[in-house]
């Protein structure tokens, strides 16, 4: 992994490829490369270790590389260390086949040994070079078309891949193959584009095709032909991307992360407006009927990272409002433990990209076991969106920063909407309560906006004071524990401070031994019935020298007797406090990172969309 672009048309390819790769930088990478052909000429391959600027400088921003057909790649090392040698593209021994690849080929070692016996030489430590030479082997063995050769290779590769391949015998053409790794293709005015994600080609076209699992495509100027695994042509309809290209730009903000924090009120409002019409929840676009809901006796929420924290908060809301049992599962664990599942259960898969490898695998496992599946995703046409029985689209728009903010917030309100509708249909709340909850939901965007406007500068000041913190502990009870988990992750991933989140009641069972003079402890106290208990936990920490931050609702002013710094959030229904309390914690993580001079939008070792296991 991590990012692929491709172009064939009438313009110089290299500048288009570099621009596309720049729009995929948020996915994380350690090296980059281009392969460009000028008509029937040889392929120019240029690679560079480090930032994309190194590659741009090598190629004079692409202007020194002739040719109108090419592929590009940003690599994040999975097989072989970060180096120019291991960077993509890779080519066959005679240069006939050149390719870039995202994913992991699990049986690359046995394939490599087979190819060595056939006379192939390997120069890198990557699994991608194996894929390139496997395609070349079958191309020469059967003397068929590129589609034939790729087909033979696909059935022998185990693992995940998105491949973009050029053949010397077919100038001006790019061939694409996909299994469990995202890829989109676009067409506009006699030109064609390929990319791992929409922002890379949004400047050039809004007309895109989604290539399915175990499918191939032949990409020519302004023309794309799709094939199934048997090599038969298949028909697809283009989809129109509704995103505004400017939505993927910083719009005057210093970083995407702070821009996306500010975009949360609109993202939440848009998501709510998509399913609340005239004061009533309408799930017709989701495809979930009242009859479907009555049939469901158990909910499983399966996700990774921040989406898992959404599930943790949603568990409390579903169980308390709808009185339906909920289990929250890490997708990376779910598929490997042969879980016992209620056949009348609903599996909710939460994923911003809709391509998260472990979540996608959990979805498929659930479907194989006969359970109904529902995806909460942000990307229209993504794998999870296509394969789930029902889809709840969040309307966050493009989220560029690796650390999620607005997508997380829209996932939360999607979960609230589902929980409220389940409660209504199952008769566990009154009509009056149903109406109250919907009214309160619709106040969240303005309350989020108020927090950002009122507390941003104070939190920035506090973050600057804590920039040298070695450790930070986030504690809370109930929903506040779920909020603490997300706050901890935010600070950890963007500021590189070692942070942990704990259920406050667990402090006595070992963790309190880590508290010493000056240790930063953040207490989340938004639940009135748990407030006093969490305050007592903070007092215990303070007595051991901790420096305390309290995050609570307006009215709990006695927290200032204990905490050294306090942030208040507006009152809301206790089921919805996550949506408000998470915002100061997002700002805290952001401003600590800024104070340390770090790359906020592209934290080290992280990728936006984890498309391999």
Locate each region found by the language model.
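Conserved short alpha-helical segments that host acidic/polar catalytic motifs at enzyme active sites
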Residues: 1-254, 266-297, 336, 431, ...
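Glycine-rich oxoanion-binding loops at beta->alpha junctions
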Residues: 68, 72-85, 275-290, 314-350, ...
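Acidic/histidine-rich
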Residues: 157-191, 467-493, 528, 535
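Generic C-terminus detector
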Residues: 231, 547, 560-562, 572-613
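Active-site phosphate/pyrophosphate-binding segments
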Residues: 264-268, 272-300, 390-520, 593-613
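Glycine-rich phosphate-binding loops that contact phosphosugars or nucleotide phosphates
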Residues: 294-436, 440-443, 524-568, 588, ...
